[in-house]
């Protein structure tokens, strides 16, 4: 990014940052040795130093989290303590409305923040209505403990009333890489705003599939005016990095990003006003 003169402020890491495999096929009782609260040693053998190097380059580290456990021993502890949201099902989701569970979760998560993680991408927490609220409550409390006066931020796939207090962003889910999806994004973000969620976002370029170059360029241009501008895509598609889309595509996306940064005093002021009112 720097060598191509493309501004970037954060890398948002998917599950590979803490585990080698996703947990979608993990059984009800969990998997032996599954990593829920550690860095993936293949990608981050020296996490504190690697994150410090990112920060020295002006880049924040944001990591995805899931509202469930994959490790069999941790799952057994949670099940014995009544900390699962649907204990009689195959679900491994945690019941974050439990104060004791939140304290346990904070203790498990704390080393990640101490290693330098800046913020969280909370995904797949739709199993019960207040999951995202209580989940963010735990994360907010922990961040204030580890880094007092540090501004909390999470990006989430859904929201409920009251989440605005957490520096909380909602994105509109795993959408298609199509012109129709691009056209829907402004409507989605306006609906979020009308419901009180002023930090809205989408996957720039869409999540599923690979967009046409012009579609991606137009998406970057539209994203200049979104509250949060974040590119993301599914595995097996062409990443939305501008330098992968030819010189003309890169130049157009760079120009859009530069406009985004020129507008930051304006958008930052609006964010401050929204928070205070």
Language-model segments: which ranges?
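Catalytic-domain carbohydrate-binding cleft regions of carbohydrate-active enzymes
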Residues: 2-277
